[in-house]
Regions:
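Short glycine-rich phosphate-binding loop at a beta-alpha junction
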Residues: 92-98
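Conserved small/polar residues in nucleotide/adenosyl-binding loops
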Residues: 198-205
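Short helix-loop-beta junction
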Residues: 111-123
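Phosphate/diphosphate-binding loops
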Residues: 7-18, 143, 147-182, 186-197
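Short, structured coil segments at secondary-structure junctions
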Residues: 118, 139, 182-184
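Short glycine-biased active-site loop of nucleotidyltransferases that positions the nucleotide triphosphate
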Residues: 133-138, 179-181
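N-terminal segments that mediate ammonia production and transfer
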Residues: 1-89, 103, 116, 130-136
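Short acidic loop-to-helix transition motifs that present clustered carboxylates
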Residues: 124-133, 151-153, 176-177
Length: 205
């Protein structure tokens, strides 16, 4: 398994040969592309004492949730550790949470926490419907896109629409090398580790 990858933009393509790869733009001109090294770890997929991986991933939720919380919450000082946030909080008056499937249900739950802990107005949208409505984009709204894999097609399409309108976009994903993470202006990884089953536990966390 390789840990090197090159991302193609829309219209670009490549020809894979025995010992090298050639990249071209949509006009057919040869171009140079950067090769990136992914932060992948060689993990052993072991069920341990569990009968199957689903039981294992469900039982591991408390540990996974703890890892995610510890990444962003300083429990000793009762503070939030989110670094390099690109906007001032005074520039944000509302939040729109966008997701599909179980990620959408996670957004519904997150709405209650936002309203409980902040004074922000919060809306939740199903990604598949978001881009078909007549959206009134607002510069003071933070659009948060939730996707475990970071590759959910409808969620990415909603993100792309927001980017076209130069909105504030944030990704909540498990895979930091994913399309949604790469094209969002800010990323909050949830640090769930490798998911074999893609059950709803990763999105819910």
């Amino acid at each position: 398994m390789t840990n090197k990858i090159t991302y193609l933009n829309d219209g670009e393509f490549c020809i894979v040969k025995k010992d090298h790869v050639e990249f071209f733009n949509e006009e057919g001109d040869k171009i140079n592309k950067k090769v990136l090294e992914l932060s992948l770890e060689d993990e052993k997929y072991d069920k341990g004492d569990y009968k199957h991986f689903m039981a294992k991933e469900i039982e591991e939720q408390p540990t996974t949730l703890k890892n995610g919380i510890n990444e962003y919450v300083d429990t000793l000082n009762n503070d939030i550790n989110i670094y390099n946030f690109p906007w001032k909080m005074s520039e944000i008056s509302s939040v729109t949470l966008i997701g599909c499937g179980t990620a959408y249900h996670s957004c519904l739950l997150a709405k209650y926490w936002f309203e409980e802990l902040t004074s922000l107005d919060v809306n939740v949208d199903i990604a598949s419907e978001f881009r078909y409505r007549k959206n009134r984009f607002k510069k003071e709204t933070l659009y948060i896109f939730v996707s475990q894999s970071g590759e959910t097609a409808d969620t990415y399409a909603a993100l792309d629409l927001c980017n076209q309108n130069d909105m504030k976009t944030c990704a909540v994903v498990n895979v930091i090398e994913s399309s949604i993470a790469r094209d969002s202006k800010f990323v909050l990884p949830i640090h769930c580790g490798t998911c074999l089953l893609y059950t709803s536990d990763a999105a819910d966390e």
